[in-house]
From Swiss-Prot:
CDD domains: PDI_a_ERp44, PDI_b'_ERp44, PDI_b_ERp44. Residues 30-138 form the Thioredoxin domain. GO terms for cellular component: cell surface; endoplasmic reticulum lumen; endoplasmic reticulum membrane; endoplasmic reticulum-Golgi intermediate compartment; extracellular exosome; extracellular region; specific granule lumen. This is Endoplasmic reticulum resident protein 44. The gene is ERP44.
Length: 406
């Protein structure tokens, strides 16, 4: 018979306190700190990684830290496998080389990675535990809608860009590559798939991928590359999903301004698809070589009345073409002139050469004066940039640099 063990009242209270603390203290997930030694290995092995690029002296970074940690705890309970979701951070003061590698221009910046590949769109939503957790849940959800009957194809939303994969089976290398691409580009296209007997009528030459452009009249396009080659498949689908001329909205304006490229914008009424098609064709014909130097965009005249007012235009004047350099706005001539070969290209070249800026301040260049006509130095005050107001706000971020005047 064992002797009874009696605890004094203070000892009993202490033991109960320790027990309660042990039971009710939540397990806090350690946020992974990234450096030059471990960053590639950790990100490459993570299905999804959300990385906080911060600086300790930044007050917005300080405010985000506890929120980021709590969101990590919430997600860790739902995705316990260490490689399913990783919450990580980079001290940009300590690791400026990493900050430069990922072009960090503001603190805090939250970037998403998939299997080591950085996604183009960073997280710009609300900085709350719920919002961050919901964002990760969305990223972990299946981006591909399975088709159970080919008749469903006839009811697709043709205002979207649709990518449809037809596969013999889901457990295949072909589908795994398709799924990987869909995870990256699901914000730009709607992805669908069909398998087995359902997809058989569309697999007469084997597994294949079809692109259905917006609109009912545009013909389908068939992918002819190797289905198991990720790079080739990704590049083909990206080319279809991310158009040369993108629409700017209030939702993506911050993202587009942060790319740092001036805007060539067509303002048009939403229902005026003819002007948009003309603009798209001329951009592709005249300016494809300028893709890395300027963003080609179109905007709804009704939604963007304020920028139009900056250039003394109203929706009644649309379609209107303009350049916003983030310092000034410059208006193209008559929209019909876009069909003159080289006219739109010269407009963009005049921006890069400084001619647009120079002529706004000092009048036409002497070379533009007609023979026998006396040159006049007519200075003007160019309208200020309107779209720079969509750039990251100093009330949400610590901004590291100002835009240079173009």
């Amino acid at each position: 018979m064992h002797p009874a063990v009696f605890l004094s009242l203070p000892d009993l209270r202490c033991s109960l306190l320790l027990l309660v603390t042990w039971v009710f203290t939540p397990v806090t997930t350690e946020i992974t700190s990234l450096d030059t030694e471990n960053i590639d290995e950790i990100l490459n092995n993570a299905d999804v990684a959300l990385v906080n690029f911060y600086a300790d002296w930044c007050r917005f970074s300080q405010m985000l830290h506890p929120i980021f940690e709590e969101a990590s705890d919430v997600i860790k309970e739902e995705f316990p496998n260490e490689n399913q979701v990783v919450f990580a951070r980079v001290d940009c003061d300590q690791h400026s080389d990493i900050a430069q590698r990922y072009r960090i221009s503001k603190y805090p910046t939250l970037k998403l990675f998939r299997n080591g590949m950085m996604m183009k769109r960073e997280y710009r939503g609300q900085r709350s535990v719920k919002a961050l957790a919901d964002y990760i849940r969305q990223q972990k959800s299946d981006p591909i809608q399975e088709i159970r009957d080919l008749a469903e194809i006839t009811t697709l939303d043709r205002s979207k860009r649709n990518i449809i994969g037809y596969f013999e089976q889901k457990d295949s290398d072909n589908y795994r590559v398709f799924e990987r691409v869909a995870n990256i580009l699901h914000d730009d296209c709607a992805f669908l798939s069909a398998f087995g007997d359902v997809s058989k009528p569309e697999r007469y030459s084997g597994d294949n991928i079809i692109y259905k452009p917006p609109g009912h009249s545009a013909p389908d396009m068939v992918y002819l590359g190797a289905m198991t080659n990720f790079d080739v498949t990704y590049n083909w689908i990206q080319d279809k999903c991310v158009p040369l001329v993108r629409e700017i909205t209030f939702e993506n304006g911050e993202e587009l301004t942060e790319e740092g490229l001036p805007f060539l914008i067509l303002f048009h009424m939403k229902e005026d698809t003819e002007s948009l098609e003309i603009f798209q064709n001329e951009v592709a014909r005249q300016l494809i070589s300028e893709k890395g130097t300027i963003n080609f965009l179109h905007a709804d005249c009704d939604k963007f009345r304020h920028p139009l007012l900056h250039i003394q235009k109203t929706p009644a004047d649309c379609p209107v073409i303009a350049i916003d350099s983030f310092r000034h706005m410059y208006v193209f001539g008559d929209f019909k002139d876009v069909l003159i070969p080289g006219k739109l290209k010269q407009f963009v070249f005049d921006l890069h050469s400084g001619k647009l800026h120079r002529e706004f301040h000092h009048g036409p260049d002497p070379t533009d004066t007609a023979p026998g006509e006396q040159a006049q130095d007519v200075a003007s005050s160019p309208p200020e940039s309107s779209f720079q107001k969509l750039a990251p706000s100093e009330y949400r971020y610590t901004l590291l640099r100002d835009r240079d005047e173009l």
